[in-house]
């Protein structure tokens, strides 16, 4: 190659590198490849130092999970123990239909659970997917991490592994989750033989509240077998992230997955870098929402990467939203996103961001030495 051609090639390589760096930045300003600065002015999304534990759940169960996780951290315990405890509280709650016991099943009526856990101190991870009959998949995932050299176990293998450590098989259905699946099976198609015949569709069932076999709030939609409030389709999932007094970081993501999913479908939750990522030098991030989008964008890894480049957890979560929208809307301008991200860093900062007009402002429960609070993040790309 001539000297002139060599110079052109060199210039082309430099231009490509500049393009890649600009693309990763997504317009967020100059890219800084260094780790988080040792000192930064405290933001309004920062606890008074560490320890700190957060969850994407903002309901009463999420708050109880944070109370129990904080007891561990406040007593000098590890972030790893704290996130497992917090996740377990949510997993065993029969009223929570997004994870564990009482989660919504697949299309066959079988509840299949996914979970991942990551320990920043050892940079180790474990996960299970399509796990049946075990209420606390995050605890099984921890054993995969600590007692094997594997990262993920799936299906029957995951169940056999759990049984070998003494986990008891249990029916994961509650009356509410089973009724929701039976209703979906009856109503998901008008071309099969499930459900009441046309002439009985609005006739009240015996013992119901009189709204009709297929009537929900407002007279249309759904009702449960007991006439309770219906359980709507959802993506499920909760994240629990913590940093302890030694400034070690850990995280858990756990889910019952997409409601009525195809048997064996696995979302982002058990995939390290997608549904969960932890870097002990930086922080942690977790995702909820449409898992397929999160997998393709490696969203949790990307959030931690952005925090390592100097972004706050809030800014990094917003960057992940922008990344997904940028990729999808290049192909389909009508892309309708539905993701939520939460993140923390070692300095005690936290943030949350979501997108899609089917979500309100994203909320997360935060517990630190300052007490318990429910934080509202930002919502983007609602139209």
Model feature map: region roles:
Residues 3-27:
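N-terminal secretory signal peptides and thylakoid transit peptides that target proteins
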Residues 21-31, 42-383:
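Alpha/propeptide regions of enzymes that mature by internal proteolysis
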Residues 34-36:
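N-terminal signal peptide c-region/cleavage motif recognized by signal peptidases
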């Amino acid at each position: 190659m001539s000297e002139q051609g060599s110079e052109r090639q060199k210039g082309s390589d430099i231009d490509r590198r500049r393009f890649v760096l600009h693309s990763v930045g997504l317009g967020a300003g100059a890219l800084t490849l260094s780790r988080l600065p040792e000192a930064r002015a405290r933001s309004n999304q920062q606890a008074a130092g560490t320890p700190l534990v957060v969850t994407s759940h903002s309901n009463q169960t999420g708050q109880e999970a944070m109370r129990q996780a904080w007891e561990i951290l406040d007593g000098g315990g590890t972030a790893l123990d704290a996130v497992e405890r917090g996740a377990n509280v949510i997993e065993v709650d029969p009223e929570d239909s997004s994870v564990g016991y009482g989660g919504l099943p697949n299309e066959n009526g079988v509840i299949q659970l996914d979970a991942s856990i990551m320990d920043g101190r050892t940079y180790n991870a474990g996960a299970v997917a399509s796990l049946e009959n075990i209420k606390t998949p995050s605890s099984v995932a921890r054993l995969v991490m600590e007692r094997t050299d594997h990262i993920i176990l799936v299906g029957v293998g995951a169940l056999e592994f759990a049984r070998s450590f003494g986990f008891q098989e249990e029916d994961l259905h509650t009356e509410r989750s089973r009724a929701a699946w039976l209703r979906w099976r009856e109503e998901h198609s008008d071309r099969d033989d499930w459900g009441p015949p046309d002439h009985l569709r609005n006739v009240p069932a015996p013992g119901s509240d009189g709204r009709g076999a297929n009537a929900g709030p407002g007279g249309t939609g759904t009702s449960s077998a007991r006439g309770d409030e219906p359980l709507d389709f959802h993506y499920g999932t909760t994240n629990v992230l913590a940093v302890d007094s030694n400034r070690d970081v850990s995280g858990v993501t756990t889910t019952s997955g997409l409601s009525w999913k195809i048997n064996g479908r696995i979302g982002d939750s058990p995939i390290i870098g997608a549904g969960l990522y932890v870097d002990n030098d930086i922080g942690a991030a977790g995702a909820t929402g449409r898992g397929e989008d999160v997998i393709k964008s490696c969203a949790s890894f990307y959030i931690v990467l952005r925090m390592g480049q100097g972004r706050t957890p809030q800014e990094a979560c917003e960057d992940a939203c922008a990344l997904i929208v940028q990729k999808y809307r290049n192909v389909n301008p009508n892309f309708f996103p539905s993701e939520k991200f939460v993140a923390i860093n070692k300095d005690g900062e936290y943030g949350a961001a979501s997108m899609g007009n089917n979500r309100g402002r994203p909320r997360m429960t935060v517990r630190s030495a300052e007490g318990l609070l429910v934080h509202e993040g930002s919502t983007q790309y609602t139209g």
